[in-house]
Amino acid sequence: MAKIDLTEYLEKLKEPEDRETVANREYQQQLFLEYVVRGDNFPEQRATLLRDYHAGKELTGPKGLRRRLGAFDLEYFGRAYLAHYFVRRSPAFHGELDRIWREGVLKGKNPDTDAKEISRADGCRRAIEAPRGHAKSTTFTFKDDLHAALYAYKHYIIILSDSSEQAEGFLADIKTELEENAALREDFGELEGRVWKSSVILLANGGKIEA
């Protein structure tokens, strides 16, 4: 029986993970460079972020460029943190949904710096009608609720649906991301709070999401 070089074997085991790590880092870099110059809102902040990138500032982490750009660019937030849901550029309809959230909920402000002001602003009532399969719930109930909870500009989020089971299903998806999403955990830290149930969760940053 041929002998196995244990060191070589262990190195081979590491290779796929290393390749995946490198590929993810390259993806995040390319995505950032694409989106930081693509949007038309917050031009001064975008220019600052681009300068910071070329100056060698960290892309990821609690003070990273990814988190800072994701605060006011909702499409980038989806593709940077939830790439398994948002796999390509958003169509025009999704851009319209993002615009509704930016203007109606965020009030045109940057939640990374103005979270308290956003949270104290008047609410927004909008009715959105579109055929099934147009990702309305994925965009609003999933992505945007996560965005509001992570950047802490909404402290009590209620998920309403046709049934409690369906609402809890959306909350379960959000919980999964908070528990297992490496990018979210790297930039926003451990967010699991003292209540973590199928119908309600409390986040470590003080936020609450209830189905």
Language-model features and meaning:
Residues 120-145:
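Walker A/P-loop
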Residues 1-123:
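N-terminal accessory segments
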Residues 123-131, 152-162:
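Short acidic, glycine/Ser/Thr-rich loop/turn "cap" segments at secondary-structure junctions
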Residues 160-210:
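Conserved nucleotide-state-sensing and coupling region of NTP-binding domains
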Residues 147-156, 179-182:
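Post-Walker A helix-loop "phosphate-sensing" segment adjacent to the P-loop in P-loop NTPases
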Residues 16, 138-139, 171:
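C-terminal PAP-associated
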Residues 119-121, 150, 194:
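Generic structural signal for beta-strand residues in well-ordered domains
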Residues 95-102, 138-150:
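Contiguous, well-ordered alpha-helical segments that form the cores/surfaces of helical PPI scaffolds
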